[in-house]
Amino acid sequence: MNRDDIIFDIHYSHYLEKMFATLTGRIDRIITFIIILSGCGVFVSVTGYFIVGALIAALSICQVVFQFSRASGVAAEHARKYLALITDEPALSNEELLSRFKLLQDSDSEPWGSLKPAAHKRASVVLGRIDNSRALTSKEAFLARLGGDLPV
């Protein structure tokens, strides 16, 4: 693996973690907002208390099971570590760079696969590489936009 490939992989990992952190953070805030808004419906003359209660319960279960806020925090921390490695990269030897990159990869979060093509495109754009990968599907583009980055 040559130095350019390592640098590309570091940038790719940084943008993947950054998008995943943003996406899961936004999902968590949206769910929290809907729970609070639905809870306020109890004080207003709303029919269908059963439906509102079921919605609140379902969203609360989603938050507990999927732990979007925790996933966001872990991914944001990894993105910061990758950014620090990007900053330190010019001063590091190839062996040192590869060693630090492998160390970071060992504790990576598990971002959704739908974000990977967008992260690949973003890393290509940032490094000035020609991107020959396929166009993003509508799902990938939507998730990338919700994740705060839709590379062209």
Each language-model region and where it sits:
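Alpha-helical transmembrane segments and their immediate juxtamembrane boundary regions
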Residues: 21-73
